[in-house]
């Protein structure tokens, strides 16, 4: 938006934006503005509000080391870069002090250069390096749509890969553009130690709470393996089985079975 306002032309190569000096200036301005606005929102503490008595501290800094993407398809991407390293130890120290760590899509090289990074890359690499339990992406769409355009409630990594294969280049069925950015990142994170990745809408009020604290959620959950699996019962399960069938036995729906009989079966 800043580039458009300034009349600066946007150039892309293979889906990557070329960040020249003018574009980098706009990126720095936008990142600084957003950071200040987020800090202001987290500083709210008015009485008789949900934030009453809150004492939240926000930490930001040069936690992300970046490197240039270089030349792609014969074009120098200039200040467009990728994550080289996340200073996970420094971030953990801040988290141990109960700070919220704010990472921007800007990284710095050991020579002091500034690079424009993709927010998906920063979020994914940070989640991996911190061994996060969850990685959450807020999107314009509700989640990952299936063939009937309903939203997949949950996908394993293998199922998510199949979705991408069936909707890739040359396929008649296409995914929403933001899903094509975030779903591969969710797959990467879940194959490198992150337990769960969530893709949810940023437009739905209460989406984050609904996704995290309800069984079905409101978006798409990506996990390394299925959340629910079937297995043969063992003797350790007898107590739980008795608890499940007792009401049915009491109502005459099932014939009563003793613990000894269940253990034998």
Question: What annotation goes with each model-predicted range?
Answer:
Residues 1-196, 203, 231-240, 245, ...:
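Nucleotide/pyrophosphate-binding catalytic subdomain
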Residues 194-199, 204-210, 221:
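Active-site or pore-adjacent capping/gating segments
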């Amino acid at each position: 938006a800043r580039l458009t306002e300034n009349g600066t032309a946007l150039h892309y190569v293979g889906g990557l934006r070329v960040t020249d000096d003018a574009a980098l200036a706009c990126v720095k301005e936008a990142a600084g503005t957003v950071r200040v606005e987020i800090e202001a929102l987290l500083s709210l503490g008015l009485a008789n509000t949900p934030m009453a008595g809150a004492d939240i501290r926000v930490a930001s800094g040069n936690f992300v080391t970046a490197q240039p993407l270089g030349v792609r398809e014969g074009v120098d991407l200039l200040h467009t870069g990728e994550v080289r390293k996340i200073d996970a130890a420094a971030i953990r120290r801040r988290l141990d002090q109960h700070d919220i760590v704010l990472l921007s899509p800007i990284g710095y090289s050991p020579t002091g250069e500034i690079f424009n990074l993709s927010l998906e890359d920063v979020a994914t690499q940070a989640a991996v390096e911190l061994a996060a339990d969850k990685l959450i992406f807020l999107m314009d769409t509700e989640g990952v749509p299936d063939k009937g355009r309903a939203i997949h409630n949950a996908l394993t990594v293998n199922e998510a890969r199949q979705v991408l294969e069936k909707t890739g280049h040359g396929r008649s069925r296409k995914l929403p553009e933001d899903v094509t950015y975030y779903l591969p990142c969710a797959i990467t994170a879940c194959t490198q130690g992150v337990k769960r990745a969530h893709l949810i809408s940023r437009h739905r009020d209460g989406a984050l709470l609904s996704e995290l604290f309800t069984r079905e959620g409101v978006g798409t959950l990506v996990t390394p393996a299925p959340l629910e699996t079937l297995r043969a019962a063992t003797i350790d399960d007898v107590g739980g089985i008795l608890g499940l069938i007792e009401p049915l036995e009491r109502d005459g729906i099932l014939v009563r079975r003793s613990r000894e009989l269940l253990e034998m079966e």
